[in-house]
């Protein structure tokens, strides 16, 4: 057999020397019929997925991590073998974190990401712990792990994930309070204020603890308060739940790229966060519905994360800014 050209099956014009998992590759040459095996690195293609004739062969790149990376393509037919340098891109494991970092012990939550299946993060193989407390893995897909937080899980402890194809576990935070910049139990706090109440169609106080009645979600933890918007804003009106300045710790200001701004959101399934909702941090604007897809937590608390390197072009003042002027007098 002989290989003269390799292209993607859906783009026969441009020759390639590598591909991604699940790409369909077209191999052109001579004596390519009567195929015995096709391998990318040491991963063999399922024979049922190969189409071959004398001058052409079609084969998908298997979605499987190689045991040995050789950066070679191997073809064996009944008439002999041929190989050619060919690089398959290995996708990295992506772990976004817990959907709710403050899930209470005994409750169920989800870890989101991608390529969990490739790295052996499955119901059978995954070892998920909070400290030494073992989490029960209920379900696992390519992009989600559903698990139960153990009853003896402790706050401010790393959650570790070890898959069957991982050399080392990955750690993500669980109930890590970090550097707290807002305390809704002391709302609006030093340097903060709300000016929404000047509009007659706005609620005067948005601070809740979950005991107000139907429709009010339970707080993340017992005794914790939260802000809730429930109502309508009239034409040319707006609802500012909080505004002011914050004190940023010096170590955060020195290396913003190492930190995320995290907060929890809970939406009614019928009222997701669309493009009319926003959080402003200096010149940075977080608009959850900017992509056209609103954020909907379907009645549960979800952790939102904004990389601080996205805020104010990676520049944060450790002492905050000047307090807003008092124009009420």
Each language-model region and where it sits:
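Beta-strand/beta-sandwich contexts
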Residues: 1-34, 79-123, 166-190
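Beta-rich carbohydrate-recognition modules and glycan-binding surfaces
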Residues: 173-329
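Short, aromatic- and glycine-rich surface loops/edge beta-strands on solvent-exposed regions
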Residues: 67-79, 155-165
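Extracellular Ig-like/FN3 beta-sandwich strand-entry sites
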Residues: 66-70, 106, 154-156, 256-258, ...
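Aromatic sugar-binding surface patches on proteins
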Residues: 50-61, 139-146, 300-313
